[in-house]
A protein has these predicted regions:
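N-terminal redox-cofactor-binding region of secreted/periplasmic oxidoreductases
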Residues: 1-193
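N-terminal low-complexity segments that are often proline-rich with Ser/Thr-Pro
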Residues: 195-197
């Protein structure tokens, strides 16, 4: 299996009992480059074939004939190494639709325990939807930006509510990005699968 988000987590889970070994093969290189550990560095990875498979969509009517970049990580840690350190579980409704289409075990309620198991969410928000002891540290920004606040106030004036935890009970609304960052002394360190698993 590859050493992306799913591969590293699955290898960790399969080998956790100590009876099994798992070989993880990654087509990309090591995750040593400094731009992988700088939040804004992800912008350079989006155009760098050393870190990104450079996939693109096909032109379609829905995109008015445009080709849309679809970045995928080509490095240890996979796309978790090139995602700007952002974290988003996805919409509850998407998982529920998969279950309704016959993929039993894939509803949001079915997978919520697994989300909670791998994360350690550092926040004062409601913890009933969040994990606290997992390997991947998820944190909120510890600062506010005047421009971002004005943007969110504008969205709120249009009826889009502020949501302090879009990975919690409700995914709708506007929020600061949650990030996969660990506090390390006076600096911060990317938390991604090759580090955490």
């Amino acid at each position: 299996m590859g050493a992306g988000s799913a591969g590293c987590i699955l290898a960790n889970r399969l080998s956790a009992c100590g009876k099994h070994s798992v070989l993880v093969l990654e087509a990309g290189g090591r995750d040593w480059h400094p731009i992988l550990y700088i939040p804004a560095g992800f912008m350079k990875t989006l155009v760098n074939p050393n870190f990104n498979w450079m996939y693109e969509s096909s032109p379609s009517e829905g995109t008015n004939g445009r080709i849309i970049p679809a970045p995928r990580g080509k490095v240890l840690g996979g796309s978790s190494s090139i995602n700007g350190m952002g974290f988003n579980r996805g919409q509850k409704m998407d998982f529920d639709v998969w279950a309704q289409m016959g993929n039993s075990g894939w509803s949001y309620d079915d997978i919520l325990p697994y989300f909670k198991r791998f994360e350690s969410y550092v926040s004062k928000e409601d913890q009933s939807y969040r994990g606290a002891t997992g390997e991947v540290t998820i944190s909120d920004l510890n600062w506010n930006d005047t421009l971002c606040e004005a943007f969110m106030d504008g969205a709120e004036s249009l009826g889009i509510k502020k949501n302090p935890d879009y990975n919690g009970a409700d995914q709708e609304g506007i929020s600061y990005l949650q990030r996969t960052v660990k506090a390390v002394s006076y600096t911060h360190l990317r938390a991604h699968e090759t580090v955490d698993y």
